[in-house]
């Protein structure tokens, strides 16, 4: 049992009974491991993904633990589907305690979504931005928002023109930009939440390069070793180890008062200089709302 995420994170004795958690992208990989770990700690869990059969299998595992579990199918490239996911959460609970923004992917072919946004950026950043905005009033006052980023956010700056273009498309470069956006978003969200009277935290993390995952298969040449070195991590990570940081951020009392940070291997790390740039955080926050044609979330908490 020591290789389970909650044991690796040192939170196996934390009691989440009565808590409600949404883990997006939880039909496989680290999302699935995170959902099951939170269930073992006592939380009721909403599972999300595109594969209904895989979602039902995770729900079955959770209900076998005695947890309340449900599955919601949603395509993250569809604004309507993301709004439908938020509506399903609001029907499920009035107080969402944990929001794990985990769903995402790495895509070889360049294409635009119906919004005219590059597909990787839309799925990996705009969708969780919209979901979080839709759920702000549903989150418990001490909720934890955990966003899956990547060490791949290093070595790139956010090219705002590339957000709406697939000219000279590189799947890995698009992935890097989206993972940088995850850290920028998570940090900007933390700053805005800090200006409210609620105690909601927002943190991002790097799960590691997991052998066999889409990320590790796509990494060119020496990059897995480079990212591991920068975050002082092993070059490869098991799925359970990758999920451990998410579980720690969702459950550990050690991070009760921690927000706006980037983590790897359950420890805070310094993200790239581009990820720490406050002007870029502000611009991304505002432009994301414009692209989605929604009011700027938490506008009263501008940096």
Where are the regions that the model predicts?
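A short, mixed-charge helix-start or loop-turn motif at secondary-structure junctions
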Residues: 24, 167, 171, 228-232, ...
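Alpha-helical packing segments of well-folded alpha/beta enzyme cores
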Residues: 37, 85, 185, 242-245, ...
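A generic structural signal for secondary-structure junctions
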Residues: 165, 220-221, 254
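A glycine/serine/threonine-rich, flexible loop-to-helix segment
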Residues: 211-229
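C-terminal helix-and-tail extensions that cap enzymatic domains
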Residues: 259-262, 269-303
């Amino acid at each position: 049992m020591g290789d389970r995420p909650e044991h690796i994170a040192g939170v196996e004795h934390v009691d989440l009974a009565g808590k409600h958690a949404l883990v997006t992208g939880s039909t496989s990989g680290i999302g699935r491991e995170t959902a099951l770990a939170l269930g073992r700690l006592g939380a009721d869990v909403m599972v999300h993904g595109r594969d209904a059969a895989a979602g039902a299998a995770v729900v079955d595992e959770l209900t076998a633990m005695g947890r309340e579990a449900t599955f919601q199918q949603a395509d993250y490239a569809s604004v309507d589907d993301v709004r439908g996911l938020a509506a399903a959460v609001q029907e499920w609970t009035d107080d969402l305690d944990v929001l794990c923004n985990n769903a995402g992917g790495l895509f070889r072919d360049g294409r635009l979504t119906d919004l005219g946004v590059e597909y990787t950026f839309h799925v990996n950043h705009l969708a969780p931005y919209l979901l979080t905005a839709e759920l702000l009033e549903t989150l418990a006052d001490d909720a934890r928002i955990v966003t899956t980023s990547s060490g791949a956010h290093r070595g790139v700056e956010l090219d705002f023109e590339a957000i709406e273009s697939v000219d000279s498309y590189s799947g890995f470069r698009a992935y890097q930009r989206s993972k940088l956006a995850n850290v920028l978003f998570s940090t900007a969200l933390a700053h805005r939440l800090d200006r409210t009277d609620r105690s909601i935290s927002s943190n991002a993390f790097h799960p590691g390069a997991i052998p066999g995952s889409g990320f590790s298969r796509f990494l060119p040449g020496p990059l897995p070793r480079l990212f591991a070195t920068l975050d002082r991590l092993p070059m490869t990570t098991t799925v359970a180890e990758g999920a451990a940081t998410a579980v720690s951020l969702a459950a550990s009392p050690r991070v009760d008062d921690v927000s706006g940070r980037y983590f790897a291997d359950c420890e805070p790390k310094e993200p790239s200089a581009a990820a720490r740039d406050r002007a870029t955080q502000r611009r991304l926050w505002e432009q994301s709302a414009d692209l989605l044609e929604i009011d700027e979330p938490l506008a009263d908490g501008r940096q």
